[in-house]
């Protein structure tokens, strides 16, 4: 590999007057190659343009140009091999150079600090995952408690409905009017519904009003029922005395 300026000038001499590399380095070698390729391309384009301008000498000039291109390409390949050798040597030298001791110690300290931080981050992530798992468990417990509360409320509402219905049965034994029975959800009947205090009140209800009452008490019925709906509603609110059961209900008004 050339080392002196004269050797470099001799090896990289060219007809394009491109300055040879000033030193045996990949930087200078690549600089020379780029300049050489650019100038060669310019000359090639100019030559081809001249060929096109002179059709009579086209074939001869084209042959000459092709030969020149072949020779120049071979020189480019030779230059490239030399630059590749320089690059490989530089890489080899850099791999053999050991950094100063203080630099190695700094890098080791940086690596230890980075490992410590990464370990801390991993611990933090595990803690977060544990907390998330605990929160999920708590959420599941709260959901279960909420479901239990809803079930308990439904049971209380059902007991309340049954309790009032039982009181109404006792009232009917003495021929008293009954009290309003809350729906199965714990709410009182809608205010726009006529109150029920006797079987006569049930008999005066429309089909829509009777359906709303039965749905509120959770009583199933068929849409085509008439008198059967009224009897079910009377039983649902505690109108179950003998004279209530024998009451002759009429159909729904049209």
From Swiss-Prot:
InterPro entries the record matches: Mug135-like_C (IPR013902)
Coiled-coil regions listed: 41-86
Domain of life of the organism encoding this protein: Eukaryota
Protein's UniProt keywords contain Metal-binding: no
GO cellular component: cytoplasm
Similarity field: Belongs to the UPF0612 family.
Name the UniProt record assigns to this protein: Meiotic expression up-regulated protein 23
Organism: Schizosaccharomyces pombe (strain 972 / ATCC 24843) (Fission yeast)
Lineage: Eukaryota, Fungi, Dikarya, Ascomycota, Taphrinomycotina
GN (gene name): meu23
């Amino acid at each position: 590999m050339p080392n002196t300026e004269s050797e470099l000038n001799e090896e990289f001499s060219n007809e394009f007057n491109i300055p040879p590399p000033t030193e045996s380095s990949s930087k200078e070698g690549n600089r020379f190659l780029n300049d050489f390729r650019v100038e060669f391309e310019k000359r090639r384009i100019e030559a081809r343009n001249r060929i096109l301008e002179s059709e009579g000498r086209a074939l001869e000039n084209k042959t000459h140009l092709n030969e020149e291109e072949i020779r120049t390409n071979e020189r480019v390949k030779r230059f490239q091999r030399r630059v590749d050798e320089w690059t490989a040597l530089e890489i080899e030298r850099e791999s053999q150079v050991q950094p100063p001791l203080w630099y190695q110690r700094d890098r080791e300290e940086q690596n230890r600090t980075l490992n410590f931080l990464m370990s801390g981050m991993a611990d933090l992530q595990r803690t977060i995952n544990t907390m998330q798992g605990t929160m999920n468990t708590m959420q599941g417990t709260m959901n279960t408690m909420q479901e239990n509360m809803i079930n308990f409320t439904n049971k209380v509402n059902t007991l309340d409905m049954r309790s009032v219905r039982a009181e109404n049965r006792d009232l009917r034994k003495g021929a008293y009017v009954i009290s309003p029975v809350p729906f199965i959800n714990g709410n009182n009947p809608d205010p726009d519904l006529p109150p029920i205090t006797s079987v006569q009140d049930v008999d005066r209800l429309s089909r829509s009003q009777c359906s709303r009452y039965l749905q509120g008490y959770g009583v199933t019925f068929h849409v085509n029922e008439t008198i059967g709906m009224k009897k079910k509603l009377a039983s649902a609110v505690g109108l179950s005395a003998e004279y209530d059961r024998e009451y002759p209900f009429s159909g729904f008004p049209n």
